[in-house]
UniProtKB/Swiss-Prot annotation:
Gene3D superfamilies tied to this protein: Glu-tRNAGln amidotransferase C subunit, N-terminal domain (1.10.20.60)
Described purpose of this protein according to its UniProt entry: Allows the formation of correctly charged Asn-tRNA(Asn) or Gln-tRNA(Gln) through the transamidation of misacylated Asp-tRNA(Asn) or Glu-tRNA(Gln) in organisms which lack either or both of asparaginyl-tRNA or glutaminyl-tRNA synthetases. The reaction takes place in the presence of glutamine and ATP through an activated phospho-Asp-tRNA(Asn) or phospho-Glu-tRNA(Gln).
GO terms classed as biological process: glutaminyl-tRNAGln biosynthesis via transamidation; regulation of translational fidelity; translation
Catalytic reactions on record: L-glutamyl-tRNA(Gln) + L-glutamine + ATP + H2O = L-glutaminyl-tRNA(Gln) + L-glutamate + ADP + phosphate + H(+); L-aspartyl-tRNA(Asn) + L-glutamine + ATP + H2O = L-asparaginyl-tRNA(Asn) + L-glutamate + ADP + phosphate + 2 H(+)
Pfam families per UniProt: GatC (PF02686)
Subunit structure: Heterotrimer of A, B and C subunits.
Source species, domain of life: Bacteria
InterPro entries (alphabetical): Asp/Glu-ADT_sf_sub_c, GatC
Protein name: Aspartyl/glutamyl-tRNA(Asn/Gln) amidotransferase subunit C
NCBIfam families, sorted: gatC (TIGR00135)
Primary gene name: gatC
Gene Ontology molecular functions: asparaginyl-tRNA synthase (glutamine-hydrolyzing) activity; ATP binding; glutaminyl-tRNA synthase (glutamine-hydrolyzing) activity
Length: 96
């Protein structure tokens, strides 16, 4: 027995302003039913002794220390600029 109907799929598609053919609605109904069935299987798992976690893998800081380094010379930075003025990038105005 399907847990979701074609009418429900069409209703949600209509709410999302998505155009959907009858064939697509039937396909999505089957796919959503499979997803709901899988989610119900997950609900049956015993997680009593499983500690809460926000990530599947252990998380640790893998970033290097933030150490200042000398920057590039201004001329080298500006050589790729499409437009420059007074040693700075010049960009088109976006506000009037």
């Amino acid at each position: 027995m399907s847990r979701i109907s074609i009418e429900q799929v069409k209703h949600v598609a209509d709410l999302a302003r998505l155009a959907m053919t009858d064939e697509e609605a039937e396909l999505f109904t089957k796919q959503l039913d499979a997803i709901i069935t899988f989610a119900e299987q997950l609900n049956e798992l015993d997680t009593e002794n499983v500690p809460p976690t926000s990530h599947v893998l252990d998380m640790r800081n893998v970033m290097r220390e933030d150490e200042p380094e000398p920057g590039l010379p201004r001329e080298e930075v500006l050589k790729n600029a499409p437009d420059q003025q007074d040693g700075q990038f010049r960009v088109p105005a976006i506000l009037e």
